[in-house]
A protein has these predicted regions:
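A basic, amphipathic helix-loop patch mediating RNA/tRNA/ribosome contacts
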Residues: 1-42
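C-terminal structural segments of small proteins and small subunits
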Residues: 52-81
Length: 81
């Protein structure tokens, strides 16, 4: 999960992504995720809490690299903000 968050550019570093997961700021399919190494699959619904906002998104792809922002945007669709 930390790698996907990094590929999709929701976190600047994987360490920040790992920290967000372990602190409970990320949910996967409505369940709190305990480990940053949790598997993310296409079609999963992810809930991100950050800066007083909650964002719901659907995973559309699994990135192979941390590419430019337009490429990262193809990995998800925002369901609700």
């Amino acid at each position: 999960m930390d790698k996907w968050l990094w590929h999709a550019r929701f976190c600047k570093t994987r360490a920040i992504a790992q920290d967000k997961v372990t602190k409970g700021h990320i949910r996967l399919n409505g369940q709190r995720v305990a480990k940053a190494s949790a598997a993310v699959r296409i079609g999963d619904v992810m809930t991100l809490a950050s800066s007083g906002k909650v964002v719901y998104l659907r995973v559309l792809g699994l990135g192979l690299r941390r590419g430019p922002a337009p490429e990262a945007r193809t990995l998800y669709e925002i369901i609700e903000e």
